């Protein structure tokens, strides 16, 4: 499993004291970095709720995409995201296109990602 080296990037240094994690990070080149095993809790959602269930960290898989909410995500990121999601759908019966949402859906008062530049149709139609 991977770990962000805070000294490698000024941004990482600024967030080193935050108590957050994700299962996967997909960087701009499409590389997958796993930080937490899928069967363990990652701390990506915070205070959240989905379909009446609270604490989404307890039962969800958190995949982060490197980027911001303005610039489009890369083709490589979509390719990797679609590929890994297909694998998760095959392995976990409860994972399906109807249960895939963004942080903005489960914590709308606090989170805005993946943002307006994320192409949900491109992603979900290719699963």
For each feature predicted by the language model, list its residue ranges.
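Active-site-adjacent loop/helix surface patches within enzyme catalytic domains
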Residues: 1-94
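Basic/polar, cationic surfaces and motifs that engage anionic cell-wall
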Residues: 68-127
């Amino acid at each position: 499993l991977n770990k962000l080296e805070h000294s490698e990037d000024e941004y990482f240094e600024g967030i080193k004291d935050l108590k957050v994690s994700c299962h996967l990070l997909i960087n701009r080149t499409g590389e997958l970095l796993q930080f937490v095993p899928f069967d363990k809790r990652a701390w990506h959602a915070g205070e959240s709720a989905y379909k009446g269930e609270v604490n989404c960290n307890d039962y969800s898989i958190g995949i982060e995409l490197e980027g911001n909410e303005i610039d489009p995500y890369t083709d490589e990121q979509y390719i990797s995201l679609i590929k890994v999601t297909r694998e998760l759908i095959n392995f976990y019966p409860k994972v399906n296109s109807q249960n895939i949402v963004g942080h903005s859906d489960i914590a709308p008062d606090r989170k805005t990602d993946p943002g307006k530049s994320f192409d949900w149709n491109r992603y979900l139609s290719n699963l």
